[in-house]
Amino acid sequence: MSGREGGKKKPLKAPKKQSKDMDDDDVAFKQKQKEDQKAMEALKARASGKGPLGGSGIKKSGKK
Protein backbone atom coordinates (compact mmCIF):
# COMPACT_ATOMS: atom_id res chain seq x y z
CA MET A 1 0.00 0.00 0.00
CA SER A 2 1.68 3.18 -1.16
CA GLY A 3 1.01 6.59 0.36
CA ARG A 4 -0.81 7.75 -2.73
CA GLU A 5 -3.52 5.15 -2.49
CA GLY A 6 -4.34 5.61 1.20
CA GLY A 7 -7.11 7.78 2.54
CA LYS A 8 -10.51 8.49 1.11
CA LYS A 9 -11.50 7.16 -2.27
CA LYS A 10 -14.20 9.81 -2.79
CA PRO A 11 -13.28 13.01 -4.63
CA LEU A 12 -12.92 16.07 -2.43
CA LYS A 13 -15.38 18.16 -4.41
CA ALA A 14 -18.91 16.94 -4.95
CA PRO A 15 -20.23 17.27 -8.49
CA LYS A 16 -22.29 20.38 -9.09
CA LYS A 17 -26.04 19.90 -9.05
CA GLN A 18 -28.04 20.74 -12.12
CA SER A 19 -29.69 24.13 -11.82
CA LYS A 20 -33.43 23.66 -11.90
CA ASP A 21 -35.77 25.85 -13.85
CA MET A 22 -37.17 28.61 -11.67
CA ASP A 23 -40.89 29.24 -11.76
CA ASP A 24 -42.57 32.62 -11.31
CA ASP A 25 -42.79 32.29 -7.52
CA ASP A 26 -39.05 31.64 -7.23
CA VAL A 27 -38.22 34.60 -9.47
CA ALA A 28 -40.51 36.89 -7.45
CA PHE A 29 -39.02 35.64 -4.18
CA LYS A 30 -35.45 36.25 -5.37
CA GLN A 31 -36.40 39.74 -6.55
CA LYS A 32 -37.99 40.55 -3.18
CA GLN A 33 -34.90 39.29 -1.35
CA LYS A 34 -32.65 41.54 -3.45
CA GLU A 35 -34.85 44.55 -2.72
CA ASP A 36 -34.87 43.77 1.01
CA GLN A 37 -31.08 43.41 0.96
CA LYS A 38 -30.68 46.81 -0.70
CA ALA A 39 -33.05 48.40 1.82
CA MET A 40 -31.12 46.90 4.75
CA GLU A 41 -27.81 48.14 3.35
CA ALA A 42 -29.25 51.63 2.98
CA LEU A 43 -30.48 51.59 6.58
CA LYS A 44 -27.11 50.34 7.82
CA ALA A 45 -25.30 53.10 5.96
CA ARG A 46 -27.63 55.73 7.41
CA ALA A 47 -27.35 54.32 10.94
CA SER A 48 -23.56 54.00 10.85
CA GLY A 49 -23.17 57.77 10.48
CA LYS A 50 -24.75 58.45 13.86
CA GLY A 51 -23.30 57.91 17.31
CA PRO A 52 -24.41 55.36 19.88
CA LEU A 53 -28.14 55.02 20.38
CA GLY A 54 -29.87 55.80 23.69
CA GLY A 55 -26.80 56.80 25.68
CA SER A 56 -28.78 57.02 28.95
CA GLY A 57 -27.94 53.60 30.36
CA ILE A 58 -26.07 52.82 33.57
CA LYS A 59 -23.01 55.00 33.62
CA LYS A 60 -19.85 53.39 34.91
CA SER A 61 -17.74 55.55 37.12
CA GLY A 62 -14.06 55.19 37.86
CA LYS A 63 -12.62 53.79 41.08
CA LYS A 64 -14.52 54.67 44.23
UniProtKB/Swiss-Prot annotation:
Residues 1-64 are annotated as: Disordered. InterPro entries: TMA7 (IPR015157). Pfam families: TMA7 (PF09072). Residues 21-50 form a coiled coil. Residues 27-44 have a biased composition (Basic and acidic residues). Keywords: Coiled coil. The keyword Coiled coil applies. Belongs to the TMA7 family. This is Translation machinery-associated protein 7. It comes from Tetraodon nigroviridis. The gene is tma7.
